[in-house]
Amino acid sequence: MKRMIALDGAQGEGGGQILRSALSLSMITGQPFTITSIRAGRAKPGLLRQHLTAVKAAAEICRATVEGAELGSQRLVFRPGAVRGGEYRFAIGSAGSCTLVLQTVLPALWFADGPSRVEVSGGTDNPSAPPADFIRRVLEPLLAKIGIHQQTTLLRHGFYPAGGGVVATEVSPVASFNTLQLGERGNIVQMRGEVLLAGVPRHVAEREIATLAGSFSLHEQNIHNLPRDQGPGNTVSLEVESENITERFFVVGEKRVSAEVVAAQLVKEVKRYLASPAAVGEYLADQLVLPMALAGAGEFTVAHPSCHLLTNIAVVERFLPVRFGLIEIDGVTRVSIE
């Protein structure tokens, strides 16, 4: 019988990341875990709908037995069974992030007995979670280099607070892992600006694009008008394609915040990324930790190791026999498997 791993949900960033990573790793390794103080420091502590959906999705895919799977719970016991490939559908029932639920369960399906398809309904454009286009255009090409083949499709947008979006991913079992080396991003090839609108006047998008174009040389400027019933909502994105990596940054528009201010937030974030020679942006960095650990080798550079990144590394090291090394050189942090 495998030992029970005890986790403190208040450690590190103290949010849902610890729980999501633990669920993924428990499903993969077969190790049960107990987590306490789930999101204890948040305004609404304990499990929200998004986290509860991730727990139930993980339990269904690996036939786990679970204690504490209810809204507001700050303690959870998860005992996994065998991971089964297949077709799955999960509904969050709010504007909670579809992609965060997907990212919880997909790693386990890399080791399933056959191909799988997972569809999640909920929020797709959430200020605190990656949109589907980030997964599709940034993360999945890098996963493919590691030997992980999955394809994410955005079927319907769902903005906060209404939700109603749908995202699906098809995934195949991994045959073998490769080593990812991302020391330098290389020269910029092109930059693309994109605005999504649903039930919002077109002039908002035009002003946002104009703000981006005032700071960067954009090779593409795209405005996409979505059906009104998918909103109201607005997201501004800027994609930076370099020789070795494509990064994508986004900001979700807010009521009573001008188009110029929304776009200026994005400009600031992209400039911060470009000011450093590091290959990987802050959010992508913590998404690479688990696949790199499973491969047993690899490295990337990031400007600043975020609390999310350090928390993710700490959880991975509890479940897998790997150790990460972080070395700062000339203002850039090199993250590697030791």
Curated annotation (Swiss-Prot):
GO terms for biological process: RNA processing. One of its GO terms (molecular function) is RNA-3'-phosphate cyclase activity. ATP binds at residues 103, 283-287. Belongs to the RNA 3'-terminal cyclase family. Type 1 subfamily. The lineage of its organism: Bacteria, Pseudomonadati, Pseudomonadota, Gammaproteobacteria, Enterobacterales. It is found in: Cytoplasm. Keywords: ATP-binding, Cytoplasm, Ligase, Nucleotide-binding. The keyword ATP-binding applies. The keyword Metal-binding does not apply. It comes from the Bacteria. One of its GO terms (cellular component) is cytoplasm. Its EC number is 6.5.1.4. This is RNA 3'-terminal phosphate cyclase. SUPFAM superfamilies: EPT/RTPC-like (SSF55205), RNA 3'-terminal phosphate cyclase, RPTC, insert domain (SSF52913). The active site is at residue 308. It catalyses: a 3'-end 3'-phospho-ribonucleotide-RNA + ATP = a 3'-end 2',3'-cyclophospho-ribonucleotide-RNA + AMP + diphosphate. It comes from Shigella boydii serotype 4 (strain Sb227). Catalyzes the conversion of 3'-phosphate to a 2',3'-cyclic phosphodiester at the end of RNA. The mechanism of action of the enzyme occurs in 3 steps: (A) adenylation of the enzyme by ATP; (B) transfer of adenylate to an RNA-N3'P to produce RNA-N3'PP5'A; (C) and attack of the adjacent 2'-hydroxyl on the 3'-phosphorus in the diester linkage to produce the cyclic end product. The biological role of this enzyme is unknown but it is likely to function in some aspects of cellular RNA processing. HAMAP family: RTC.
